[in-house]
Amino acid sequence: MNFLRGVMGGQSAGPQHTEAETIQKLCDRVASSTLLDDRRNAVRALKSLSKKYRLEVGIQAMEHLIHVLQTDRSDSEIIAYALDTLYNIISNDEEEEVEENSTRQSEDLGSQFTEIFIKQPENVTLLLSLLEEFDFHVRWPGVRLLTSLLKQLGPPVQQIILVSPMGVSKLMDLLADSREIIRNDGVLLLQALTRSNGAIQKIVAFENAFERLLDIITEEGNSDGGIVVEDCLILLQNLLKNNNSNQNFFKEGSYIQRMKAWFEVGDENPGWSAQKVTNLHLMLQLVRVLVSPTNPPGATSSCQKAMFQCGLLQQLCTILMATGIPADILTETINTVSEVIRGCQVNQDYFASVNAPSNPPRPAIVVLLMSMVNERQPFVLRCAVLYCFQCFLYKNEKGQGEIVATLLPSTIDATGNSVSAGQLLCGGLFSTDSLSNWCAAVALAHALQGNATQKEQLLRVQLATSIGNPPVSLLQQCTNILSQGSKIQTRVGLLMLLCTWLSNCPIAVTHFLHNSANVPFLTGQIAENLGEEEQLVQGLCALLLGISIYFNDNSLENYTKEKLKQLIEKRIGKENYIEKLGFISKHELYSRASQKPQPNFPSPEYMIFDHEFTKLVKELEGVITKAIYKSSEEDKKEEEVKKTLEQHDNIVTHYKNMIREQDLQLEELKQQVSTLKCQNEQLQTAVTQQASQIQQHKDQYNLLKVQLGKDNHHQGSHSDGAQVNGIQPEEISRLREEIEELRSHQVLLQSQLAEKDTVIENLRSSQVSGMSEQALATCSPRDAEQVAELKQELSALKSQLCSQSLEITRLQTENSELQQRAETLAKSVPVEGESELVTAAKTTDVEGRLSALLQETKELKNEIKALSEERTAIQKQLDSSNSTIAILQTEKDKLYLEVTDSKKEQDDLLVLLADQDQKILSLKSKLKDLGHPVEEEDESGDQEDDDDELDDGDRDQDI
Amino acid sequence: MAYAYLFKYIIIGDTGVGKSCLLLQFTDKRFQPVHDLTMGVEFGARMITIDGKQIKLQIWDTAGQESFRSITRSYYRGAAGALLVYDITRRDTFNHLTTWLEDARQHSNSNMVIMLIGNKSDLESRREVKKEEGEAFAREHGLIFMETSAKTASNVEEAFINTAKEIYEKIQEGVFDINNEANGIKIGPQHAATNASHGGNQGGQQAGGGCC
């Protein structure tokens, strides 16, 4: 090594000279020899010298070696030697055993040679193309050389590979190599290639790296696998860390599901090899990469869901509760579980339900908290538990409520059999171990974070101190301990808890101020001129006082906003106060804690700030400063303004509502209007349509009329059309005749009807006369005759009607036939035409005529319809006359009955008369017998006359 | 989660033609009028159904800028489908199609299905490239063609799904070697498993997959 150092110094001594000469000779041979064997031997010799005389070989031979790579590709042996030599020159790996001071130099050497090599980007491309050779002796040294180039000067080499076409893809093929050495070295190459280069990471992922690497890990036995698994895991981490696109691809490719198998660690395996611990550690970290709080929220939450759905979280919880897990792994598992559940309600709920397999089973949360407040547990483990607890409560109101509830009087388990989370936290808060104090305070603060309900609930908590003494509230106890002046860590923890508790909770502020010792204590702390160590506590006290002012609802007369402000001005001074307040954010550990949610401290002394608390400070520092500087008048004004603003708001909301209502109404009305408009339009269009239709009909009618006239004229001249359509006019004329006939029939019918009407009239009149004369007998035969006549006529009419309707149907069929014929003709016409123009004209003419004819037929149809209507009318009349006849008949029958009745009466009277005559005669004879004068005969004769007269009348009637 | 096939797509075309918006509309069903320039490539995925089969689409949206061209070229080889996008309101993006197509044909596998997309069809008033021109270009180069609007979501589904249909048909015809993942096609885990256990039942479509 002295030797090398001499060279580096630039002082050439005797013995080196010969070596340099040898190298020079070898280089000349490589350059000039025409024989491959010669060249190969020379390169081999260079290779053997390259380790020992790295600098010389590097300086003199690099150019020649690259040339060999370009020109001698056909001989794999010489290529292999050349690659090995280059690797020896560039790589620093072989120098590891060398003492410290020379390592630095050799590192420089490696990077310098790398720089020379990549100065020509084609050299790297050349190397990439050599990797396509399947020959092991070429591929393997090629991989190693490229790896060391990447290790030496990552970014420029990455850039060259990225730009060369399919460069990354070619390197990805190494993972598919069946020779394990190449595959494994390929993994290392890809590690170097993907280091902090997002673009390459994405291409590698695109080329199915996830699939391949997960396959390799599975093949190698997951965490039980060797260093290859470790290398694969590191590569996976490279691909996923801070690369959202790849994380999304990983999740979408359902690769999270494949991670579950990694954590199926059996209890039966007590021996944990160092490699297994490393592998598992990397596996856990890979899970954390996917759910890191610094990832975009959407990405993290979808991964969290997937981890619960595939059972990965459950598997991790099993490890958490298992025995015999190395503390290192356990800690990382707790951290991993923390991030898997953080802010994800489903996972948090699941975590709350996990029980330790103890007897009786205890919730995992309780078991973990026991470790947190246990001094004997490793520091990192306690930090991890705190983190886990924080993550469990992050955005988890339900969980916060459950934790606080374990402290409330109503829910505390009276039997005291099982320890609750709340008891453990209180125990930690007031234990003698300051680390426990801090952790418990921060944990409790997280149970209150952003949850006003729990802040109020926690005020109810009472602590039993010692027997005989009255219970003390938790808030009181915290301030008591604070004033006792314990370790800084304890006080900082308690102050953070109090600040979190009081912020956004005026009731808690009132409770706090109610204890008259608190404000003097705070002002005393802030005002005192203490050493640097106490500055942080002073700052926190200032913050607490500021919170007591800012969230004060002025319910305590002694401690209104105004009075507290005056107190600051008198006792501390505004400027001084603000300066003290500023101590918090100026603290060196403050910015550290504000970066990441995980409480990650190198040692317990650094455990000062909590991440969520730093957020609170950021939020409050400004507003408190403003509140302190504001005068009371301004305060009042502001309040007034607030009030008026509220009023305005009310008015505005009122109007807004009104506007909303009106808007709704407007909308309704608009709709109505639009529907009405629509209807109106529809109607109007209907009207115009109808009008136009009417117009059309009129026009058609006129046209028809005209054409009919024309048709007669042109029939002769249009021999072609006439020949084709000749049938039609004839037919129509025939139809017309028939209609004429029908009309005459109708006329006839009508006249007959009129006749019948008169007959009926006669009948009626005769009936009336008959009734008055009481001579109905003669009437009836006449009537019957008439009825018979009528009936006959009716039947005749009916038959006529029948025949007419038959004729009509016939006509109709004929008509339709005609129409069909006309249509076919119309179709055939254009085909027959000779010149297009003529035919077109003709066809239009024919079409016109056709339509005219159609119109005519339509009209005829209409007439037929009218006729049939008339017929039905006649039928109706007939029916009505028939019914009148029937009525008359019944009346006649009635009259007959009456006549017969009166005849009977007459007969009866005649009989009676005859009887009486006889009686009279007998009486007369008796009287004569008795010798009575027979003068009374006259009288009886007169009576008889009278009777005769009556008889005559009766007789008349009979006649 | 289970899918019958997995297709890899790439989206290419000039910068600002709306590639990322098309992807966003397809995967998230939303439109973002102001979109950051894509750096390199971004990944998106969605499940679709064709012929009753679940098909997972993995889509790589590439940067259109010239400076990223070398990076985006690395994605051609492993893709089964490409959406080549131009902007109907910018003629230059249409004029560059030939370059894009040459690039794609040079670096991709020969069976890659390319869908030509004229995006921003909602901006009819600013149209510079007629639909007929797009159709003609597609006809001339054997591409499928469609006009889309990432803003109104018009035809966006169709563009992605029709490309998948074309690939699916090619698989049925046996054009694609589905066992070579470098083609951008993968058989789903369940599918492959059932294929192996009782290959006869599944038969037909992927007979080549399980048997040989």
Curated annotation (Swiss-Prot), chain A:
Keywords: Acetylation, Coiled coil, Cytoplasm, ER-Golgi transport, Golgi apparatus, Membrane, Phosphoprotein, Protein transport, Repeat, Transport
Protein name: General vesicular transport factor p115
Region spans: Disordered: 925-959
Main location: cytoplasm
Gene field: Uso1
List of residues that carry N6-acetyllysine: K202
ARM repeats: 20-60, 61-121, 123-163, 166-207, 208-253, 255-310, 311-354, 363-408, 420-459, 473-513, 518-571, 573-630
Protein family per UniProt: Belongs to the VDP/USO1/EDE1 family.
Gene Ontology biological process terms from the UniProt entry: endoplasmic reticulum to Golgi vesicle-mediated transport; Golgi organization; Golgi vesicle docking; intra-Golgi vesicle-mediated transport; intracellular protein transport; membrane fusion; regulation of cellular response to insulin stimulus; secretory granule localization
InterPro entries: ARM-like, ARM-type_fold, Armadillo, P115_Arm_rpt, Uso1_p115_C, Vesicle_P115, Vesicle_Uso1_P115_head
Post-translational events: Phosphorylated in a cell cycle-specific manner; phosphorylated in interphase but not in mitotic cells. Dephosphorylated protein associates with the Golgi membrane; phosphorylation promostes dissociation.
Coiled-coil region: 638-930
Superkingdom of source: Eukaryota
Recorded domain comment: Composed of a globular head, an elongated tail (coiled-coil) and a highly acidic C-terminal domain.
Gene3D superfamilies named among the record's database cross-references: Leucine-rich Repeat Variant
From Swiss-Prot, chain B:
Residues binding Mg(2+), per UniProt: S20, T38, D61
Leading EC class: hydrolase
Cellular location(s): Endoplasmic reticulum-Golgi intermediate compartment membrane; Melanosome; Endoplasmic reticulum membrane; Golgi apparatus membrane
Gene Ontology terms: biological process: autophagosome-lysosome fusion; Golgi organization; macroautophagy; protein transport; Rab protein signal transduction; vesicle-mediated transport
Superkingdom of origin: Eukaryota
Motif (Switch 2): 63-72
Keyword GTP-binding in record: yes
UniProt feature, compositional bias: Gly residues: 200-212
Lipid moiety-binding region (S-geranylgeranyl cysteine): C211, C212
PROSITE patterns linked to this entry: RAB
A molecular function (GO) term: GTP binding
Main subcellular location of this protein, as a coarse class: endoplasmic reticulum
Pfam families for this protein: Ras
Span list, region Disordered: 190-212
Subunit: Interacts with PRKCI. Interacts with TRIP11. Interacts (in GTP-bound form) with GARIN1B. Interacts (GTP-bound) with HOPS complex component VPS39; interaction contributes to obtaining a functional HOPS complex that promotes autophagosome-lysosome membrane fusion driven by STX17-SNAP29-VAMP8. May interact with VPS41.
Job description of the protein: The small GTPases Rab are key regulators of intracellular membrane trafficking, from the formation of transport vesicles to their fusion with membranes. Rabs cycle between active GTP-bound and inactive GDP-bound states. In their active state, drive transport of vesicular carriers from donor organelles to acceptor organelles to regulate the membrane traffic that maintains organelle identity and morphology.
Name this protein carries in UniProt: Ras-related protein Rab-2A
Lineage: Eukaryota, Metazoa, Chordata, Craniata, Vertebrata
Primary gene name: Rab2a
